[in-house]
């Protein structure tokens, strides 16, 4: 791809994302499906703007690589050890059972047994990028089903090596392509990477951080991620697995949060590129020629994987309310199928259109997952938001709620308990099924689902409620919900949680004046206690705290028009000088 073509492709990708994703979100089908549809539109079987799909698809796998690095940062080695049973138990069982069933079905459709085995293994894998993205969107990350889903995905990444090694054996060319010496060298290189990373990464980043240049730190982070991916690719292993291990090795370091911040923008863009590339790879010619075969294959693939995953979740002890989420989010084929099937094709394991048919099946199965998860959400909403059983009725009044609390994490729990203790009628909206089960057990009136859906807000009693308290984890969700409430329920008093100063500015700009910065009040109270321990009179410390709070709020309001501007820096300096003058005047008054 030449320079001008590459630039044109970049512009087309950005345009497709900007146009399709907001439209898909407005239609309620999710960003992932929007990316896939955008890829179909600009790909060789759509408008034909881009034809070199394979090269772009390989490059776009970097999105998955960055995502796995960030996930690794969130898991320390001890946490990974705790997941060993689910990784090597449920993960291994899912791959083996799904592969066996799917291979058997492929043999019934004129696939040779060798091709059927490869096809079964490839179809048994799920899409790491899609599953993790959907788990985040659905708030599954910290739930039991989310942890189990991650374990299955991690085992699938580990299974890449034996799967690729199996291909030449099945093709009858083991003597030429299966060199045990090379495999031994690869294992040694992998172990060397683990040991080197364990003892070298933190000192290296400590040295880089000492320079104080943020750009160098970002460059070093990119070098680590891309270097790990390149090293693993050279070994014939999963690039995503390499960056995941690098993330785990740095999970307990003091640079974890800085690393996440440096990588996050690249991860989002490249993940979008990956999904667009998958959409572009959909061969509509094969789909049209073998429509019935493909449709049946997609249905069977999704059904088999859901059945296996659901049964494993049940055996593992996952709550019944979470099993369908777990099964649905992993029900699609994955990106590894593109690599495995290409390798098998080069070994002449497939005949005719067999490889193309399998790839179309994988791509379409990925497109069904967002829609399937919406159906699962609707089913769960009916299960949890319908009439309650007699023995599950909350002790609060059954009248319409006075307050709706959105999100019931640690922040929302404190608010909910306070309101309940004062006999206020509250309704909670939560999308974590584990939390929903727990809250119902303790007498809360709770609705499961996405609070940005107007129908759910209406069902929860937003039209009759007096106030809504928004405690979402993501600032984007908070602002979207504020906009929806102002548009559809203008009578509601909106109170919101602000994670930091930037979000507080955004809330003020949106007209929300009742908000709480989650760390500000507690930090201010601890600061007051610190002043007292340093010898300041308690009353004086209390006044200092009050002055600081008032000045900070005034600064916050004054800086709304320019909160992203450099003028804020000089204004902040003035505010610090003003605060210092207030403290000095107080000290002088105390001495008199």
UniProtKB/Swiss-Prot annotation:
InterPro entries: Cation/H_exchanger_TM, K/H_exchanger, K_H_efflux_KefB, Na+/solute_symporter_sf, NAD(P)-bd_dom_sf, RCK_N. It holds the Pfam family Na_H_Exchanger. GO terms for biological process: proton transmembrane transport. It comes from the Bacteria. One of its GO terms (molecular function) is glutathione-regulated potassium exporter activity. Residues 400-519 form the RCK N-terminal domain. It is found in: Cell inner membrane. The keyword Transport applies. It is a multi-pass membrane protein. SUPFAM superfamilies: NAD(P)-binding Rossmann-fold domains. The chain crosses the membrane at residues 4-24, 29-49, 55-75, 87-107, 115-135, 152-172, 177-197, 207-227, 230-250, 268-288, 291-311, 324-344, 356-376. Gene3D superfamilies: 1.20.1530.20, NAD(P)-binding Rossmann-like Domain. One of its GO terms (cellular component) is plasma membrane. Keywords: Antiport, Cell inner membrane, Cell membrane, Ion transport, Membrane, Potassium, Potassium transport, Transmembrane, Transmembrane helix, Transport. The keyword Zinc does not apply. Belongs to the monovalent cation:proton antiporter 2 (CPA2) transporter (TC 2.A.37) family. KefB subfamily. Interacts with the regulatory subunit KefG. PANTHER family: K(+) EFFLUX ANTIPORTER 3, CHLOROPLASTIC (PTHR46157:SF4). Pore-forming subunit of a potassium efflux system that confers protection against electrophiles. Catalyzes K(+)/H(+) antiport. This is Glutathione-regulated potassium-efflux system protein KefB. It comes from Escherichia coli O157:H7.
